[in-house]
Amino acid sequence: MAPKFPDSVEELRAAGNESFRNGQYAEASALYGRALRVLQAQGSSDPEEESVLYSNRAACHLKDGNCRDCIKDCTSALALVPFSIKPLLRRASAYEALEKYPMAYVDYKTVLQIDDNVTSAVEGINRMTRALMDSLGPEWRLKLPSIPLVPVSAQKRWNSLPSENHKEMAKSKSKETTATKNRVPSAGDVEKARVLKEEGNELVKKGNHKKAIEKYSESLLCSNLESATYSNRALCYLVLKQYTEAVKDCTEALKLDGKNVKAFYRRAQAHKALKDYKSSFADISNLLQIEPRNGPAQKLRQEVKQNLH
């Protein structure tokens, strides 16, 4: 007796998933297509299921190098369930492969509004930023399409999904890729980094800390060997009450320069705001070993001391 050929949406999707895992992308694509036709013929409204099928078929197109059909299917998936992470990432990858860097940047950036821990989006943004700076120059941000504002409901939907979805795509965003960390900047990169850092400094003077963060981030993409750039970005994070980010940047700054007084002071401030008084006190103590007469540090030490007891 011949094996039963799958005919329900669930069976077709499961068969498609199996073919995809086995590297049979054309077969998987056909199975997802059949599942879509069956679902649509039923006339029942199940946008989540339909969106997943479009997104899965898009993954097949991407594997086969068919970027235009990948973009088309991802767009269909997103029309059904806006701000879904997988189709956004797949469409971004397809745009990137077609060298449509502004469109790829927008999709990666949209993903990071939903979940800023998605490593592939962090890495994608870094690649697109470098590509756009090279192709469009320092004013590249002005030439981008508008980036949609992600509603809170979309963020909540993602956070409510099973943890497997997050594990599949998310790692700590503080871990830069090995390629970026190990890349030795050229003299041109170092100069570009210096100019961008100065632009960030000017924005700080004007009180525009959000824009300054963008400039410092671009600077660090060109060269991540400048301790002051990390500690300057940390200041912006402090002002914006993003204390965990400030701690991370100060730590990076101190890895590069163990006597960076500003990094010690700003990390102490961030630790204090996070109510980690022990770490704050340790940072102030280290700072005062370098600069015993630092007035602001002495004052901060007194404030932290009161909270330690």
Swiss-Prot record:
Coiled coil: none annotated. GO terms for cellular component: cytosol; intracellular membrane-bounded organelle; membrane; mitochondrial outer membrane; mitochondrion; nucleus. The modification Phosphoserine is found at residues 8, 160, 186. The keyword Chaperone applies. Plays a role in the import of cytosolically synthesized preproteins into mitochondria. Binds the mature portion of precursor proteins. Interacts with cellular components, and possesses weak ATPase activity. May be a chaperone-like protein that helps to keep newly synthesized precursors in an unfolded import compatible state. Belongs to the Tom34 family. PANTHER family: MITOCHONDRIAL IMPORT RECEPTOR SUBUNIT TOM34, RNA (RNA) POLYMERASE II ASSOCIATED PROTEIN HOMOLOG. Ubiquitous. SMART domains: TPR. Pfam families: TPR_1. There is a cross-link at residue 197 (Glycyl lysine isopeptide (Lys-Gly) (interchain with G-Cter in SUMO2)). Interacts with HSP90A, VCP, ATP6V1D, KIAA0665, AMPK, and DMAP1 through its TPR repeat. GO terms for molecular function: heat shock protein binding. Residues 161-189 are annotated as: Disordered. It comes from the Eukaryota. The lineage of its organism: Eukaryota, Metazoa, Chordata, Craniata, Vertebrata. It comes from Homo sapiens (Human). This is Mitochondrial import receptor subunit TOM34. TPR repeats lie at residues 9-42, 51-84, 86-118, 193-226, 227-260, 262-294. It is found in: Cytoplasm; Mitochondrion outer membrane. It is a peripheral membrane protein.
